[in-house]
């Protein structure tokens, strides 16, 4: 029996649902995921460049500190594994092979990727015996054997060259896309410095996605303190808190920062940049690519048809 399924044609200009955007440390380029592939676009806007064309789902691009490499996850071999490729594209190298989901969150240095996964380490090194609270692992870009970096759940890590590390915690199993969440398990931001852990936020809602400011004495982050997720900045000692964006309809997601202080984030399916002392600017993105969706998908079925 022939089955015809109508599909939607690909958008080319001003596309929506550009996800997991990340500005390069040198501030020149923004990487993002769109329709299951990784793209880059100049930080000033323009035509996007498609880096992956595999039929699998590719997402969560993460920049190396020197802006020369991108790590991302892909299910092209069955489960979500971590891959790395040159910023210009080309064949990616597979770094992980576990049968579970592995998602890159940061580069520890130019040669080491940090990623989260629920691989379940030994009882001596795990925080809670539940796969919903992932551990952090590290793997070399040469695809060496992964090593446990932290049994403590650390999400959206931002790390400085001296090893000082910011992250938001994960105390429970609440969906990260839930909005207006108030409970004892809302996320807070922490600093790990020289083996000591310091809690930096205490709002009874969501504070998450910290990124270091250039000098290392302050940081940017996302908070629902004003009712919806917006970008804030504060000093490490908790002083001089500033709200930098004032979006009201939808939450801000995917905050990253270049070393010159330029911020990049996603809002309402589009990408914005924010320079110090300026107002947020929506990034104009044109995606010029071959159409990958079919108008008709013809399938021949021999069993299983029902009215």
Model-derived segments and spans:
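Conserved beta-strand position repeated across blades of beta-propeller domains
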Residues: 22, 62, 106, 158, ...
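Bacterial N-terminal signal peptides
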Residues: 1-6
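Sec/Tat signal peptide C-region and signal peptidase I cleavage site
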Residues: 7-11
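Short N-terminal segments immediately surrounding and downstream of signal-peptide cleavage
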Residues: 12-27
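Beta-propeller domains
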Residues: 40-44
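Signature of short aromatic-glycine-proline-rich micro-motifs recurring in repeat-based ectodomains
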Residues: 18, 153, 302-307
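Short coil/turn segments that connect the beta-strands within blades of beta-propeller domains
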Residues: 26-28, 66-68, 110-112, 162-164, ...
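A flexible loop/linker signature enriched in serine peptidases of the S9 family
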Residues: 13-15, 33-39, 52-58, 71-83, ...
């Amino acid at each position: 029996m022939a089955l015809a399924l109508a599909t939607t044609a690909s958008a080319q200009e001003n596309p929506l649902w550009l996800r997991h955007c990340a500005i390069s440390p040198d501030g020149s380029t923004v990487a993002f995921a769109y329709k299951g592939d990784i793209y880059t676009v100049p930080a000033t806007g323009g035509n996007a460049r498609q880096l992956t064309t595999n039929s699998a789902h590719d997402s969560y691009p993460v920049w190396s500190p020197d802006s020369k490499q991108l790590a991302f996850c892909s299910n092209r071999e069955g489960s979500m594994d971590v891959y790395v490729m040159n910023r210009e594209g080309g064949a990616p190298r597979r770094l992980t092979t576990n049968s579970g989901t592995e998602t890159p969150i940061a580069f520890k240095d130019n040669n080491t990727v940090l990623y989260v996964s629920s691989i379940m380490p030994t009882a001596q090194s795990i925080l809670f015996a539940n796969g919903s609270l992932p551990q952090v692992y590290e793997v070399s870009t040469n695809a060496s054997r992964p090593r446990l970096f932290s049994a403590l759940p650390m999400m959206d890590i931002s790390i400085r060259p001296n090893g000082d590390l910011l992250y938001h915690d994960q105390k429970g199993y609440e969906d990260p896309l839930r909005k207006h969440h108030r409970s004892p398990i809302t996320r807070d931001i922490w600093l790990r410095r020289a083996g000591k852990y310091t809690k930096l936020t205490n709002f009874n809602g969501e504070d998450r996605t910290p990124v270091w400011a250039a000098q290392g004495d302050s940081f940017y982050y996302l908070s629902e303190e004003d009712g919806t997720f917006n970008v804030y900045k504060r000093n490490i000692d908790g002083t001089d808190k500033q709200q930098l964006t004032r979006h009201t309809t939808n939450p801000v997601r995917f905050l990253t920062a270049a070393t010159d202080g330029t911020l990049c984030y996603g809002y309402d399916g589009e990408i914005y940049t924010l320079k110090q002392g300026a107002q947020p600017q929506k990034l104009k993105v044109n995606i010029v690519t071959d159409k990958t969706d079919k108008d008709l998908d013809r399938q021949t079925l021999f069993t299983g048809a029902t009215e």
